[in-house]
Amino acid sequence: MKAIGLPDDLIQKGKDIKGVSEVVQEGKHFKVTITTGSKMETMTGEKVKTVVRMEGDNKLVTTFKGIKSVTEFNGDTVXNXMTLGXIVFKRVSKR
């Protein structure tokens, strides 16, 4: 998290937080439409334009500011891995 510019207090808040995310899928439309440009907000609050690609039937992939984000849906599990160089951040959630 430090590698993407998050200060220590936000890193600690991220470790302590228990959140709920809503994911709604209608065909190839999630909150973004696959393969079209969309604006996303980074963990530092910066808004960036990126393209989200769908790989297979259950994986969303995008790259922004040198970070590769892969979100995979398997049954009731949502796994997200973000990679910056040799640093990998993984989060697993339940639907």
Swiss-Prot record:
Modified residues (Phosphoserine): S21, S38, S69
The entry's keywords: Cytoplasm, Lipid-binding, Phosphoprotein, Transport
Keyword Cytoplasm: yes
GO MF, one annotated term: lipid binding
Location relative to the cell: Cytoplasm
Pfam (any one): Lipocalin_7
In-chain residues carrying the UniProt-annotated modification N6-succinyllysine: K13, K18, K28, K39, K47, K59, K90
GO cellular-component term (any): cytoplasm
Modified residues (Phosphothreonine): T33
Domain of life: Eukaryota
Subunit structure: Monomer.
Functional note: This protein binds free fatty acids and their coenzyme A derivatives, bilirubin, and some other small molecules in the cytoplasm; it may be involved in intracellular lipid transport.
Annotated family: Belongs to the calycin superfamily. Fatty-acid binding protein (FABP) family.
Protein name listed in UniProt: Fatty acid-binding protein, liver
Organism: Chaetophractus villosus (South American armadillo)
